[in-house]
Design a protein with these regions (language model features):
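A short helix->beta-strand "capping" segment at the edge of beta-propeller domains
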Residues: 14-38, 318
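Surface-exposed loop and turn segments in beta-propeller and other repeat-based domains
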Residues: 27-33, 73-82, 119-129, 178-197, ...
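Beta-strand-rich domains and repeat architectures in extracellular enzymes and scaffolds
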Residues: 30-58, 278-280
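Residue-level detector of Asp-centered blade-edge/turn motifs that repeat once per structural unit
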Residues: 45-47, 91-94, 139-141, 205-207, ...
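Asp-box/WD-like beta-propeller blade repeats and closely related beta-sheet repeat scaffolds
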Residues: 104, 112-141, 147-157
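Short, conserved, GDST-rich strand-edge loop motifs in beta-rich repeat architectures
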Residues: 147-163, 280-303, 347-360
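Beta-propeller blade signature
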Residues: 160-175, 294-316, 357-367
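Loop/turn-rich, solvent-exposed surfaces of beta-rich toroidal or solenoidal domains
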Residues: 259-314
Length: 368
């Protein structure tokens, strides 16, 4: 797919294409520059404003759709007012901002990004990784929904964690009280007693439906939040290429990244009119070994041997075409609706340009 470039004035015509088509393309409408020099380690964008996290400074930066910075806030890592690595960021519809660190701390922030409160659960999270642009924090019906493993001492690195435990917590942000939510359905191979590569868990919510994905299975599992998170159905989004290293002979084997690279869901966006899956295809063993892609110095070469793809699943489970995303487009901040523009980080390393600002592409999904 070729990414088309249109001026902003063309947006109305683009959005008015036939509603019957299942073929889509990705259009770059514009770009904005945020006058900040630093890395982006997680973020969100909703209702005309965005926020991103800079790891080196333990800082959040909030900006608007013109690129203007409204607030910058660095946080102490100990003592009063500490906020530790708030990489997961989610705005609510009414403008509240919640954050989670990659090791489980949960926060609510004021509109000027100062700390409003730390949300403390009765038990600690046992997670030691994750965060960033993974989608594992959301808000529904006055409750936070979070991937927060640790209830009853559950270890998320146990090979049967996904099979044996609830995967999410529904959290009262005022009290820290929580109830467990969502069990993996039998449609997932992780419900069995076999061993597989450890996946990342992501989810999103639209209305009363929660959609959950494990990163190395091409499936979306759908649950009803109005019925305590009961399982409804599973959709296989049928990628034409999504490599997988299969069943392991013993636990704690890590094959992906050492001998080959699994296909992986990188981001998941759930909207009223459809779910968008952003995934990478993976790299087979022969290419991986020949090019020594297990070495950190060669990690940037991954982009030479696999594609990154968007695919849309309609509410009635009709699948779109595969929309190839060029690598100059990096992680997506959020997709609020299939008919709304959204923002994605420009990959300056891939483009080969060093700038003293951060560029976000303004994008739109358009039916052909």
């Amino acid at each position: 797919m070729v990414v088309l470039v249109y001026g902003c004035s063309d947006q109305t015509n683009l959005s008015s294409k036939s509603s019957e088509s299942t073929d889509w393309e990705l259009v770059i409408l514009d770009s904005i520059q945020v006058d900040y020099l630093g890395s982006v380690g997680g973020g969100d964008f909703r209702n005309g404003k965005g926020v991103f996290f800079n790891f080196q400074e333990n800082k959040l930066i909030e900006f608007d759709s013109t690129g203007k910075i409204h607030y910058e806030r660095s946080y102490p890592t100990d003592g009063p007012g500490k906020v530790l690595y708030p990489t997961q960021l989610r705005y609510t519809d009414d403008g509240r901002l919640f954050a989670a660190s990659f090791v489980g701390w949960l926060y609510e922030l004021n509109r000027d990004l100062t700390l409003k409160q730390e949300i403390t659960l009765p038990f600690p999270s046992q997670a030691n990784d994750g965060g960033g642009f993974f989608r594992s924090l959301d808000f529904w019906n006055d409750s936070l929904i979070s991937y927060y493993p640790g209830r009853d001492g559950a270890n998320p690195y146990d090979p049967y964690f996904i099979r044996d435990h609830f995967l999410l917590e529904k959290i009262d942000s005022k009290t820290g009280g929580s109830v467990p939510l969502i069990k993996i359905p039998s449609t997932s191979r992780y419900s069995s007693d076999k061993f597989f590569e450890r996946p990342w868990i992501q989810f999103g919510i639209s209305g009363t439906r929660l959609h959950l994905a494990l990163s190395n299975e091409p499936m979306i599992h759908v649950f009803d939040l109005n019925d305590g998170g009961s399982y409804l159905h599973t959709v296989n989004f049928k990628p034409s290429k999504f490599l997988d290293n299969g069943e392991h002979q013993e636990k704690y084997q890590y094959i992906s990244g050492s001998r080959m690279l699994d296909g992986a869901i990188r981001q998941l966006f759930v909207t009223e009119k459809g779910t968008v899956v952003y995934y990478e295809e993976g790299i087979d063993e022969e290419i991986f070994v020949q090019n020594e892609l297990n070495l950190p110095k060669n990690f940037p070469k991954y982009k030479d041997f696999q594609k990154q793809v968007l695919k849309i699943i309609s509410p009635d489970t009709i699948l779109s075409n595969e929309i190839i995303v060029p690598y100059r487009i990096g992680r997506i901040m959020n997709i609020e609706g299939l008919d709304k523009p959204f923002y994605a980080l420009r990959d300056d390393d891939f483009v080969g340009e060093e700038q003293e600002y951060i560029t976000f592409y303004k994008l739109l999904l358009v039916k052909k």
